[in-house]
Amino acid sequence: MDRSLDVVALGEAMLEFNQTQQVPPMYLQGFGGDTSNAAIAAARAGARVAYLSRLGQDHWGHLLMQLWAREGVNTTGILQDPQAPSGVYFVSHDGRGHHFSYARAGSAASRMHSTDVQTHWASLIGASQWLHLSGISLAISPSACDAAFAAMHSARAQGTRIAFDSNLRLSLWPLDRARACITEAVRLCDLFLPSLDDMSALTGLQQSDDVLDWSHAHGARLVVLKLGSEGTIVSDGQQRTRIAPHRVQAVDATGAGDCFAGNLLARLCRGDTLEQAARYANAAAALSVQGHGAVAPLPLPAAVQALLQP
């Protein structure tokens, strides 16, 4: 089969308004949505990328289409919905970190449905090396969850590998449902990208080795556990390697995990081992926290290579 794409990602893209000043309040307009951020990060890293979603036929949706065109992301899989809006979110900052407020109820992306996969997306999934999804892809609505699982089953049937990022947002769904759906996604995926915080909330496990054991026991062949400021741990089920963080002056960590995921997949498509790809993605994510917003600070390869130079 022709693998004309490296990564297809499925989820919800949104307009972002990121706080740059508290008094008086000022916000910088940008773009977000975890899997869209990851898709753009992968494209900037040189991957051939497509995005799968629904958008409103509104100004916000038009801006997102322009963004993907600028970034070289294939939009064949974007379905425009005249009956629902595109989603919007706000990011505020304080001494405890960054906080999100969403205006996404009833969004076009929440109207994704399992029939969209067979009707519109199966061929794109089959043309790609990787399908990337997240916990948010599952959480935004029951029908979107059905679409995400249909996409995963389509990927497995066509030999496309699946990467799944935990991205737990308990504001979107109850813990019991999140636990059940994410556990099933782990069973289906080839590469699981959890954070320690997410897995502690989902499973009650506090130690990284216990989380890695749980992940492999529930079906994930490869796991990259994100530890925030403590770096990452890469595991193939036999060997575990800790990758130290890069010390940088963090301004806004909004899309750091998405940057990590996109760069990791892009490097795997270029032939890196999982450890090599994770070291590259670790550096890219460190660079991404030095600017405001989820998309604008996503680095290009030259900057990542410069940080990796001894």
Enumerate the predicted regions with their spans.
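Short, conserved phosphate/pyrophosphate- and ester-handling motifs at nucleotide-, phospho-/glycolipid
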Residues: A42, S195, G257
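Conserved N-terminal subdomain of the carbohydrate kinase-like
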Residues: R48-G135, A306-P310
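Glycine-rich phosphate/adenosyl-contacting loop at the front of the ribokinase-like
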Residues: M1-N74, V251
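Conserved beta-alpha-beta core of the PfkB/ribokinase-like small-molecule kinase fold
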Residues: W130-D213, E230-G231
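Structural alpha-helical scaffold elements that stabilize or flank donor/cofactor-binding regions
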Residues: S123-L124, E184-A185, H216
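Conserved phosphate-binding/catalytic region of the ribokinase-like
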Residues: M1-V8, H153-A157, G204-P310
